[in-house]
Amino acid sequence: MAVIEYEGTDISAQVAVSRCVWDAREEGRVPRLSLRFDDAQGLWDSWAAKPGDRIAVAAEGAAATGTMYVKRISPIAGGYEIEADALPVPDTPAVREWRQTTFKVVAGELAAVLGLRAVFHGCEDMPFAYVRQDAQGALPVLAKLCMLAGCTFDVYDGTAHVCARDWAASQESTGTLEVAASSEYEYRTQRAYTLCTINQTAIAGTRAGIVASYGEAGFELAAKLDETIGMLGTSEMKRACAGMLACANARRSGGYVKSDSLSPYSPGSVCTVECAKAPSLSGLAIVTRVRNDFENKTSKTWWRKIA
């Protein structure tokens, strides 16, 4: 049975849950929690629940949701629906600018705006000439910077975990993800990019144009930096090319498996995939997304192999 805590109080025995699904991803997607309580007697309304309240779900053998924050409460026939996510405060569009700064400085400040603490794992502090948040939320800016710096990040329990991709791939396995012959599963692989070229166009009086590449000739990924990011020079551009190349290739392969049990993994976990029917899929992998259905005790786990 799942344990549901609302504002620090265990309410599991006081509510009849008909839906409880936690969906968490890496790559800067915010974990979400969707619940439905059957409440024929109208008790829930007397609790004065409101957006911003804290809620958490845990179950034996499953990854816990960590603290989530209510974003929407909807009375429905015979009950209530609650939607929550892992951000303590909404990601409100804003205009901010940093000059002669570094990746960790900007990432830390963007996380703080969201009510999060940034923790860096194996990340180099990449310099930037300037970064501008241009009437948009903090999350997309942070995601872009992480991509250029060769990092990914996920949000969990009040913390933005920013991980260098090579650091994440070097971690030891924390367990086994079994893909049984009877399981519903899929894995896709697309051709990997071998070269990334980035063109930073010149802006009069602001920056010079820079073109840089990383990799080997073959299947090229070409990109442009918009006016919200300014690099210091060619060496930094090459690092950005490497980061963008790694990010693009990570998205070109991956799979999932459905299970009749809850997943113990959270995004970013390293595990060992065992697939008897397709041994080529077996080996070390990084979990990229988890969807735990606490009420039906089922899960869907997405992963990508570590080359």
What are these regions (language model features)?
Residues M1-G8, A143, V155-D157, A164-T298:
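Acidic, small/polar-enriched beta strand-loop surface segments
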Residues M1-D91, A180-S182, G254:
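Assembly/oligomerization scaffold segments
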